[in-house]
Amino acid sequence: MSSQVSSPPRAGLNARQAQTVERLLAAADQELREVGSDALTVRSVALRAGVSSATAYTYLASRNRLFAELFLRHLHSDHPPAPRGADPVARVQAVTRHLARSLAASPELAAGVTAALLGSDPDVDRLRLRIGAEYVERFREALGEGADPAVVETLALAFSGALLQAGMGLMTYTEMGERLDVVVATILRGHT
């Protein structure tokens, strides 16, 4: 997965353009907290950031792109603790619980990004891969040296499925973290 993701989200931007994107994302974060995911628009974010709508759409061509960029920013700023635990099962469970807590703490972002990542917006394709690569890397790190790629992929698929169920309201993100404990233990049985 990571081989498909080679360029950072702001590759090719000069310092001023990167600063504009950062202002837009900071404004989007504030706007999301105040109005929620349903009411958030690229235009309202542009207004809050003090840039024209045309400028905002240059960097964030769609609402889905905005949510995906916000979520990737959230993942990168999250700074998870180093995976701790006596064994790979405990370390992966710590990773899934941390991610679930992070989503539970940002329900509006979780709601917006769920729809964005499930959509067919081509502007989100690269970000979808980068987000998935972030999950894969966290699982790989928790498993340690020599992690079986099939196990890593299975964990990523299980986590994605749990995200989908939580995003559909079938469980809370907190419940997702709890339920993934059993899933992780089952997947890793015999592989650690």
Residue ranges and their predicted role:
Residues 120-157, 175-185:
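Amphipathic alpha-helical packing segments from all-alpha helical-bundle domains
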Residues 1-7, 101, 137-145, 168-192:
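C-terminal peripheral helix-coil segments that are non-catalytic and often amphipathic
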Residues 69, 80-108, 155:
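Hydrophobic alpha-helical connector segments
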Residues 101-143, 164, 168-169:
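Short secondary-structure transition hinges
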Residues 1-19, 30, 192:
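N-terminal intrinsically disordered/low-complexity leader segments
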Residues 23, 27, 31-65, 69:
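Helix-turn-helix
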Residues 23, 44, 65, 94, ...:
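Amphipathic alpha-helical interaction segments
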Residues 72-78:
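Short, basic, alpha-helical segments at the C-terminal edge of helix-turn-helix-like DNA-binding modules
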